[in-house]
């Protein structure tokens, strides 16, 4: 299953970058799925939307970073996360990387 492979790749990234194993808590929803990561130095919530249904002005096949708090090197870690998604998202059919909120 594509979703499972994506989660495995994301968990591997988190393990290699931060040393956290199997950190992703995955929740299915009507649009795709969401991943919540709450670790000592990392607090992230990311939506993987196959179908946006017009919500939030996000296009279909979007990865939406809702929350990304890194205890150390926030800007550098966020750029690295974006690089990971830009490399891997085409493999799984995702076309857009977006952020939510922030005014």
Which stretches of residues belong to each language-model region?
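Non-catalytic substrate-recognition and accessory regions of acyl/acetyltransferase enzymes
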Residues: 1-73, 83-103
């Amino acid at each position: 299953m594509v979703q499972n492979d994506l989660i495995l790749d994301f968990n591997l990234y988190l393990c290699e970058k931060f040393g956290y194993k199997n950190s992703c808590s995955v929740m299915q929803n009507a649009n795709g799925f969401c991943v919540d990561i709450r670790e000592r130095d990392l607090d992230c919530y990311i939506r993987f939307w196959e179908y946006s249904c017009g919500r939030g002005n996000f296009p279909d096949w979007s990865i939406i970073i809702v929350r990304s708090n890194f205890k150390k090197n926030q800007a550098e870690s966020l750029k690295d996360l974006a690089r990971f998604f830009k490399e891997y998202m085409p493999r799984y059919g995702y076309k857009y990387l977006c952020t939510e909120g922030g005014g």
